[in-house]
Amino acid sequence: MSNRMWGGRFASGPAEIMEEINASIGFDKRLAPQDIRGSLAHVAMLGKTGILPQADVAAIQAGLKTVQAEIESGAFTFARSLEDIHMNVESRLREIVGPAAGRLHTARSRNDQVATDMRLWVRDTLDELDAQAADLQRALAETALKHAGTVMPGFTHLQSAQPVTFGHHLLAYVEMLARDRGRFRDARARLNECPLGAAALAGTSFPIDRHATAAALGFDRPTANSLDSVADRDFALEALSAAAIAAVHLSRFAEEIVIWTSAQFGFVKLSDRFTTGSSIMPQKRNPDAAELVRAKAGRVIGALSGLLIVMKGLPLAYSKDMQEDKEGTFDALQTLSLCLAAMAGMVRDLEPVPEMLKAAAGSGYATATDLADWLVRELGLPFRDAHHVTGRLVGVAAARGVGLEALSLAEMQAEEPRITAAVYDVLGVENSVASRTSYGGTAPANVRAQAERWLKALSETK
């Protein structure tokens, strides 16, 4: 039997495998709230423009609300034979209100309908991601404020480089998340145009009011070109791009948590709430939450790559290939949502181990740059000369197996006779971080001010 929504031209129904590959209801049913919102706005516009009689409009609106209630309660039965969410809703609407339901699709195609549904869903989800990223920022800033003066090693190449503070390290991720939130908002602003009324690809001959439906659905304006309206999914690509970048940031932080919680580092502890055990090794406490965030970033990045590949060879306007925009987009954005929530929980659960952090901060000659800076500042050496002197002193200390602060003044003066005992003031890790007072530097006073600024800003924004 042919599909009664479009089957007039067909003498028989599709093959079973055709029905299976063609159907999207298994995943696009999550668009039901957006689909019904779009239909309510569309039918209201059809009534206001006189295209439909008010009696039909009222019946359709009441029927759509009944369908919505059935879906929300779990009473609705989705049928694969009806392909997608649009036809499932319309079929049930016809059962409820009769032939008037067939008027709902006046001046509309599934092409502009699904483009509208997807924009609404992505817009809603970007708003949720923005709020979740803000919550993670808040958790990071709160922890940073508590540990503004907790010294830890800063790394390059995963080798000890210069001392920083734990709070300063966390605030780096607050800044990254701020840019992520900016990308979410930028993507939202660009997608906030309404395709409804573009119809299949060429517009419609009915005297519709696209500005009215756009306004009713919270869009800034209708899309300006009917072909573009139904032919592109760059709004989903942009959202996925923003999500992928955010996922990379979360993955990097998750990797650090995995490293920091290891026995070899011991920088931080996670409670039982965010760790798991081993089925064979009773001593294990595995940072599985962090590892899963790290892994799930790959799914988000993969969804972006997948949709780019789907779209790259499609001529205008709509092709069925574009049905493949949904699963990856749904999964990626909801995966990022899960990861943001998990990271916020872990940040609030993290317990730094100050003695381990401080001990590591002083290892690996991490104050060598402070020594070089002292030679420049106090003795007037060009920085390159100071760099060489410091390098030779590091070599002396390494040969003895001690830190720079353990070298005698005589040993230092053997490399640079003008060095005085005042040099020892810059070789402690606390003095090192306290001296980094440049804007954006790791000095505890800077970190406190930045954390407080962020907490104030986050309390004032949605």
From Swiss-Prot:
A GO CC term assigned to this protein in UniProt: cytosol
N-terminal signal peptide: none
Assigned keywords, A-Z: Amino-acid biosynthesis, Arginine biosynthesis, Cytoplasm, Lyase
Matching CDD domains: Argininosuccinate_lyase (cd01359)
Main location: cytoplasm
SUPFAM superfamilies: L-aspartase-like (SSF48557)
This enzyme's EC code(s): 4.3.2.1
GO molecular function: argininosuccinate lyase activity
Family statement drawn from the similarity comment of this UniProt entry: Belongs to the lyase 1 family. Argininosuccinate lyase subfamily.
Listed name of the protein: Argininosuccinate lyase
